[in-house]
């Protein structure tokens, strides 16, 4: 059986640039300008707006997206988008998610998704076995 670690090559970091808060981090980084999404997505948004952003990013994120920076803490709920992409490639219950935050971010928010609710959505992904919150 093929061991995926044998062919592992780190991917250049991706910067989802909503607000210009992430300075250059590495040579070869891929910066995706998303300033036009800032107001619709900051802190939280409707499911419709989140789905629209997810569809947009599907067309611009590299297939082998590794480390992704998302700007200030106003946008960390966007973590769910690359996480969902990863989960589509993994078998069920094969991924542990580690969240470093001083809030659990697992609230239920019936009107969409926001910085305090994204972890509850992450936990529902079939590939996610456990979510560990440290902080």
Where are the regions a protein language model picked out?
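Conserved alpha-helical scaffold segments that buttress catalytic/binding sites
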Residues: 2-135
């Amino acid at each position: 059986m093929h061991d995926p670690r044998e062919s592992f090559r780190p991917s250049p970091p991706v910067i989802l640039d909503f607000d210009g808060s992430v300075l250059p981090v590495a040579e070869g980084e891929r910066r995706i300008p998303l300033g036009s999404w800032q107001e619709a997505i900051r802190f939280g948004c409707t499911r419709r707006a989140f789905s629209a952003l997810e569809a947009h990013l599907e067309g611009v994120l590299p297939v082998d997206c590794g480390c992704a920076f998302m700007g200030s803490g106003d946008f960390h709920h966007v973590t769910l988008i690359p996480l969902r992409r990863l989960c589509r490639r993994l078998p069920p219950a094969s991924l542990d998610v580690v969240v470093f935050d001083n809030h659990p971010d697992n609230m239920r928010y019936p009107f969409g998704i926001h910085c305090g609710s994204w972890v509850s959505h992450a936990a529902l992904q079939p590939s996610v076995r456990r979510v560990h919150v440290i902080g």
